[in-house]
Each structure stands twice: as structure tokens, then as C-alpha cells.
Amino acid sequence: MIKDNIVIRPEKKEEYREVENMVRESFWNVYRPGCLEHYVLNQLRDDPAFVPELDFVMEKDGKLIGQNMFMRAHIKADDGREIPIMAMGPICITPDLKRHGYGKMLLDYSIEKARELGCGAVCFEGNIDFYGKSGFTQASKFGIRYHGVPEGEDASFFLCKELIKGYLDGITGEYTPPEGYFVDEALAEEFDKQFPKKEKLKLPGQLF
């Protein structure tokens, strides 16, 4: 996709480290002191569930400003079936360009590409205030539970969007994120030493 001075295109192997550093900058001290997302991204690329056709970067005036990626996943339906879906993320925009509409542009483009590949639905963890603008709703409205969250407890972070209308009709079940999203924090700490040193801060609003 090319629009004005914005390009969305597949990620190239030779820019993996540059993209990882961008992700690190975007998530640093946001949800926890430091971040894990750049290591998660590094690990997901080698995961069997990784969808290389849906591994995107965004450029503005030739400079990388964002990325998004998808993983194959499934819902374990209560009737015993496994319903193929996709998981999404990490997705990011560089800190200096957040809240300028680039994130929604990247999100909407990549979701449409997932639809073109035949993806029926996308589930992931996110903020409904942002992702709701692109048609995501809380997954509980589809009858989908998040693994490990007891029934009745808050799972408002768990979002879903049908890409094929009616794809989740009549389905109830449980979603577990693909294994690649679960990383060893000690290994993540070692990986982070490959990047420029940054101060980890405990800040209000962090989740961990």
C-alpha cells in the first residue's frame, strides 16, 4: 500500500534488528519496567504459527515507523472442534508518531490482508478504546473465553473481530494465545543486552 508519503509493505529479513529496536522503543516502560515485545517479535518469526505473508512494516518518507504481524491460532470449541483463527501482534507505531492515525491505518490495512487470506476471525489482547474503532469487540460477546481467566472475572482486554461475517456463529469455547507469545523473561533480559542501554522505570499505569 502506498498513500501520499506512507508505505505499508512486507518486512525484510535484513531489517529485522531495526524493526526490533523500533518495537523496543515503542513499548519501553509502557506496560512494565523495560519491555519484552522486541524479544517476543524475535521469537515469533521462527514459530511454526507465524504467517510471513502478514508480517508488515510501515514507512513514512522512507523511515520505518510501525509494524504488525499475525500468527495462526484456534479456538477450542466446547463441542470439541478446533476453529482456525489468527492472533495479532505485537503491533506498534514509533512513540513520536502515536495518536496521528498511523496505527489505525496500519491495523485496518493488515486486517484486510488477513481477510483476503481467508482468515475468519482475529483474537488478541488490547485496548477496546483504540481497537474498537476498527470493529473489535470484547471476545466474551462471541462466547469466547480467555484461557486461565475464571468465568465471571474481568477479561475486557481480550478482543475479537470477525473477518468473515457469521464465522463464529453458534461457537462457544476457549482461546489460548499461540505458544510463541510466552517467553522466558531471563532469556528476554539477555536478548535486550544486544540493544543500547535504557533505564527501566516503574511508572503509574503499568500492568506488570
Task: Show the residue positions of the predicted features.
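Conserved acetyl-CoA-binding loop-helix of GNAT-fold acetyltransferases
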Residues: 88, 93, 99-112, 123-124
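A conserved beta-turn-beta hairpin within the catalytic core of GNAT-like acetyltransferases
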Residues: 74-88, 98
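Active-site rim helix/loop that mediates acceptor-substrate recognition in acyltransferases
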Residues: 20-23, 27-69, 74-75
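Acidic/histidine-enriched, glycine/proline-rich intrinsically disordered or flexible terminal extensions
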Residues: 165-208
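Conserved active-site alpha-helix within GNAT-family acetyltransferase domains
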Residues: 116-119, 126-153
